[in-house]
Amino acid sequence: MLRAQYALTSGPFRNFMKLSFLPIALSAALLGGVAHAEDDGHEGGHSRLRVHFSKSSETDLVTVVVGDFQRSPENNYLIGATWGHDLSDTLFGLPIPMTWHIGVPWFNERDFQQDGYGATTFVKANHRMRVPWTQKHIDLGLGEGLSYVSRIPTSEERDFEKKGEGIHSEKLMNYLEWTIDLPLRQFDALEPLFRNGGIEDMSVGFIVWHRSSVFGVFAETKGGVNFMGFGFEAKF
């Protein structure tokens, strides 16, 4: 009966249900996992501001996370800013610090079309890893959420169009973010810069900014775009 009622619903409403289910379910699972940490007394936390520059890449997500970069023919790029705050120090009881973020990217389309802008919102899992044979460490981050753009980037639209006539991307898509950051305060020469100041630490690092349809959940077929670049993040 439920299947019959769903079949009678209008196309736009079915699409809305389809697009909404995945991010809502994933967010509920993540937030459910961090609720335990907050109930156990984790309060307050740090805020952080990231500014980054990223260029469109033809590289698949599988290899893009290790820095494999193949420039898109359009050579378009984005400049983004992201604000985040600590959410929890654990995820499902595991020592994985979680943060929530909102971001604003601006896209330079290199005269292929008008420039665009967008918004991202996501939850991010973080892990601090010591560099082998040293006493230094790097911070790894993996974020999952939603991305909305005022105008679909040309490199993304081309990725969909090559899959068939009339195939297009969507303004609302799934969002993934992968970061590798090097905190600067751990270096003795730079540590005095952060004493008695408003900025507790600052990092320089690599970022992958990824939009995709999640194998056709957000659009007619699978597809997406990667932007790869570098940025700075200040922790308050």
Annotate each language-model stretch with its function.
Residues 49-55, 62-70, 97-110, 204-212:
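Transmembrane beta-strand segments that form the barrel wall of outer-membrane beta-barrel proteins
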Residues 36-86, 218, 233:
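Short glycine/proline- and aromatic-enriched beta-strand/turn motifs that initiate or cap beta-hairpins
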Residues 45, 73-79, 115-121, 171-178, ...:
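Residues that define the transmembrane beta-barrel architecture of outer-membrane proteins
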Residues 66-74, 110-114, 166-167, 217-221:
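Outer-membrane beta-barrel domain signature
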Residues 85-89, 100, 113-218, 234-236:
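Outer-membrane beta-barrel transmembrane domain signature
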Residues 82-106:
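A glycine-rich, hydrophobic loop/mini-helix early in the fold
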Residues 1-43:
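Cleavable N-terminal export/targeting peptides
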Residues 220-236:
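Long hydrophobic alpha-helical segments typical of transmembrane helices together
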